[in-house]
């Protein structure tokens, strides 16, 4: 079942240690088949280099295991909440990458200071509010997804494909699992650049909005011209 998606999700998970986004098993990638309403996700607590594509777990959008011998990631309810809310998202990544997680632990959003940021994120990368005691002690992972959805109530998740969960770490997404990993790598680099920028000048202001728009829309707008035409 969903063998091609399993292989894609498996390979996407292996990029997390390759790009130094995870330590031990501190992260996961998932992908969704929208037509079937099924999600493929990394198994919980399994080392990346011990996994096979057949170890990926298939669940429905309510979290029921449809196929797989292993338990799905403990973050599965968060992924599912995002898939239910963001209908254009096709892949999700969660990591504890050092620089992005540092911003999350500080409870700080990441302003757009330069064009590297603007090429992928159309504005500030938000940080969620702190979760309440009731949310933490209740259905914690599902509530983590809900607080992310709340944060994007007036934002386009495809224009800002990532978030920092307060006191936790980043969740990032894309149109498919590989794009989600790409965005996770970019988020980590942007977080590092932002912190280094502030270490040079703590009074640095966000970049000019005209420049922000130019860089974002040249890659993602209707008249985008960056890269090669698809044939």
UniProtKB/Swiss-Prot annotation:
It catalyses: L-ribulose 5-phosphate = D-xylulose 5-phosphate. Pathway: Carbohydrate degradation; L-arabinose degradation via L-ribulose; D-xylulose 5-phosphate from L-arabinose (bacterial route): step 3/3. Its cofactor is Zn(2+). One of its GO terms (cellular component) is cytosol. Zn(2+) binds at residues 75, 94, 96, 168. Substrate binds at residues 27-28, 44-45, 73-74. GO terms for molecular function: aldehyde-lyase activity; L-ribulose-phosphate 4-epimerase activity; zinc ion binding. InterPro entries: Aldolase_class_II_sugar_metab, Aldolase_II/adducin_N, Aldolase_II/adducin_N_sf, AraD. Its EC number is 5.1.3.4. The keyword Transferase does not apply. Involved in the degradation of L-arabinose. Catalyzes the interconversion of L-ribulose 5-phosphate (LRu5P) and D-xylulose 5-phosphate (D-Xu5P) via a retroaldol/aldol mechanism (carbon-carbon bond cleavage analogous to a class II aldolase reaction). Belongs to the aldolase class II family. AraD/FucA subfamily. This is L-ribulose-5-phosphate 4-epimerase. It comes from Halalkalibacterium halodurans (strain ATCC BAA-125 / DSM 18197 / FERM 7344 / JCM 9153 / C-125). The lineage of its organism: Bacteria, Bacillati, Bacillota, Bacilli, Bacillales.
């Amino acid at each position: 079942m969903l063998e091609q998606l399993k292989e894609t999700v498996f390979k996407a998970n292996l990029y997390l240690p390759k790009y130094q986004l995870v330590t031990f098993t501190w992260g996961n990638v998932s992908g969704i088949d929208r037509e079937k309403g099924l999600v493929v996700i990394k198994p919980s607590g399994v080392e990346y280099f011990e996994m096979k594509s057949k170890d990926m777990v298939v669940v429905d959008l309510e979290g029921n295991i449809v196929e797989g011998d292993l338990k799905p990631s403990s973050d599965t309810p968060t992924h599912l909440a995002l898939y239910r809310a963001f209908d254009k998202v096709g892949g999700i990544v969660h990591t504890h990458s050092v620089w992005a997680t540092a911003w999350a632990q500080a409870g700080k959003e990441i302003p757009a200071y330069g064009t590297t940021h603007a090429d992928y994120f159309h504005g500030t990368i938000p940080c969620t509010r702190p979760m309440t005691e009731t949310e933490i002690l209740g259905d914690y992972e599902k509530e983590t997804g809900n607080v992310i959805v709340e944060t994007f109530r007036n934002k386009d998740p495809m224009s800002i494909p990532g978030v920092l969960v307060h006191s936790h770490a980043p969740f990032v997404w894309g149109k498919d699992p590989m794009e989600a990993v790409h965005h996770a790598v970019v988020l980590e680099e942007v977080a590092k650049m932002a912190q280094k920028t502030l270490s040079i000048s703590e009074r640095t202001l966000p970049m000019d909005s005209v420049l922000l728009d130019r860089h974002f829309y040249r890659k993602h707008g209707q008249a985008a011209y960056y890269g090669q035409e698809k044939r």
